[in-house]
């Protein structure tokens, strides 16, 4: 098994939920950290979720406020394991307001 560290990003996330990362086939992924930066001119509220193909979708973060010019790193040492075809999503209550940075380790 190979372990590969990767950085995934998604700029200008807004009201429409965006896929930041989809786990490739034959891969397990460990999410090491997620940072959400507010790039808008005002405060906004964000959410992070996991969409799974064969089970319930879940929220990791819901309606979390991020002040103007600030960022949020909400995992604080916790890890989340994702399986093949799981999708990590981000949304905001303000268009083009969030830059999302995801640090992961893929196990293949």
Name the predicted role of every residue range.
Residues 47-51, 101-103:
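Beta-strand signatures of extracellular beta-sandwich domains
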Residues 53-87:
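Intrinsically disordered, low-complexity Pro/Gly/Ser/Thr-rich segments with frequent PxxP/GP/PP motifs
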Residues 51-55, 107-108:
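Short edge-strand/loop segments of extracellular domains
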Residues 1-33, 91-108:
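C-terminal interaction-tip segments
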Residues 30-32, 44, 62, 84-86, ...:
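A generic structural signal for short beta-strands and their flanking turns/coil linkers
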